[in-house]
Amino acid sequence: MSGGKYVDSEGHLYTLPIREQGNIYKPNNKAMAEDMNEKQVYDAHTKEIDLVNRDPKHLNDDVVKIDFEDVIAEPEGTHSFDGIWKASFTTFTVTKYWFYRLLSGIFGIPMALIWGVYFAILSFLHIWAVVPCIKSFLIEIQCISRVYSIYVHTFCDPLFEAIGKIFSNIRISTQKEI
């Protein structure tokens, strides 16, 4: 397995796929990572996507799983002909399937582009604007918090301590009259 090639059991020579070989910046195969005492790094931009399970985090479990039975139902005693029911089921299912494919074919790439730009802008603003503003605010507020702490310990603590001592001598007695 030298030079990014391997031999199968029948003696055929193959090159490893690019994803297993890594790139020029970080090796992504186990042999090179072990040789360099590094952990194997996977790039999020070149990872393979799962074409079978397209919702691995179950984002749409409660929302988009709409089947024929979820939309159209005939109660007991009010049934159409069996052929009509089967044709309606087939029409609904096939129409939903192909119309979704048509819409995703037309609008899928542009919407992916729009959402990619949107989340890139959000990430950029969070990294380069929001977090630095919050950090600078926390640094600047430390000065005010120290002055406020001195003010509270100097003026408010003695005042409220004195008020507490005044009210601590109040005794209440209750009597029940019949």
Curated annotation (Swiss-Prot):
N-acetylserine, modified sites: 2
Family to which the UniProt record says this protein belongs: Belongs to the caveolin family.
Primary localisation category: Golgi
Name of this protein: Caveolin-1
Keyword Transport: no
Segments of this protein annotated with the region Interacts with SPRY1, SPRY2, and SPRY4: 149-160
UniProtKB keywords: Acetylation, Cell membrane, Golgi apparatus, Isopeptide bond, Lipoprotein, Membrane, Palmitate, Phosphoprotein, Ubl conjugation
Positions on the Cytoplasmic side per record topology: 2-104, 126-178
Record has Zinc as a keyword: no
Entry's Gene Ontology molecular function annotations: ATPase binding; identical protein binding; inward rectifier potassium channel inhibitor activity; molecular adaptor activity; nitric-oxide synthase binding; oxysterol binding; protein kinase binding; protein tyrosine kinase inhibitor activity
Region: Required for homooligomerization, residue numbers: 2-94
GO biological process: one example: negative regulation of endothelial cell proliferation
Function noted in UniProt: May act as a scaffolding protein within caveolar membranes. Forms a stable heterooligomeric complex with CAV2 that targets to lipid rafts and drives caveolae formation. Mediates the recruitment of CAVIN proteins (CAVIN1/2/3/4) to the caveolae. Interacts directly with G-protein alpha subunits and can functionally regulate their activity. Involved in the costimulatory signal essential for T-cell receptor (TCR)-mediated T-cell activation. Its binding to DPP4 induces T-cell proliferation and NF-kappa-B activation in a T-cell receptor/CD3-dependent manner.
Sites of Phosphotyrosine modification: 6, 14, 25
Complexes and interactors: Homooligomer. Interacts with GLIPR2. Interacts with NOSTRIN. Interacts with SNAP25 and STX1A. Interacts (via the N-terminus) with DPP4; the interaction is direct. Interacts with CTNNB1, CDH1 and JUP. Interacts with PACSIN2; this interaction induces membrane tubulation. Interacts with SLC7A9. Interacts with BMX and BTK. Interacts with TGFBR1. Interacts with CAVIN3 (via leucine-zipper domain) in a cholesterol-sensitive manner. Interacts with CAVIN1. Interacts with EHD2 in a cholesterol-dependent manner.
Pfam families: Caveolin
Linked residues for Glycyl lysine isopeptide (Lys-Gly) (interchain with G-Cter in ubiquitin): 5, 26, 30, 39, 47, 57
Membrane topology: Peripheral membrane protein
Positions of the UniProt region annotated as Interacts with SPRY1, SPRY2, SPRY3 and SPRY4: 131-142, 167-178
GO cellular component: caveola; endoplasmic reticulum; endosome; focal adhesion; Golgi membrane; membrane raft; perinuclear region of cytoplasm; protein-containing complex
Intramembrane stretches listed in the entry: 105-125
Lipid positions (S-palmitoyl cysteine): 133, 143, 156
Chain intervals for the UniProt region annotation (Interaction with CAVIN3): 82-94
Post-translational modifications reported in the UniProt record: Phosphorylated at Tyr-14 by ABL1 in response to oxidative stress. Ubiquitinated. Undergo monoubiquitination and multi- and/or polyubiquitination. Monoubiquitination of N-terminal lysines promotes integration in a ternary complex with UBXN6 and VCP which promotes oligomeric CAV1 targeting to lysosomes for degradation. Ubiquitinated by ZNRF1; leading to degradation and modulation of the TLR4-mediated immune response.
Modification Phosphoserine occurs at: 2, 9
Annotated compartments: Golgi apparatus membrane; Cell membrane; Membrane, Caveola; Membrane raft
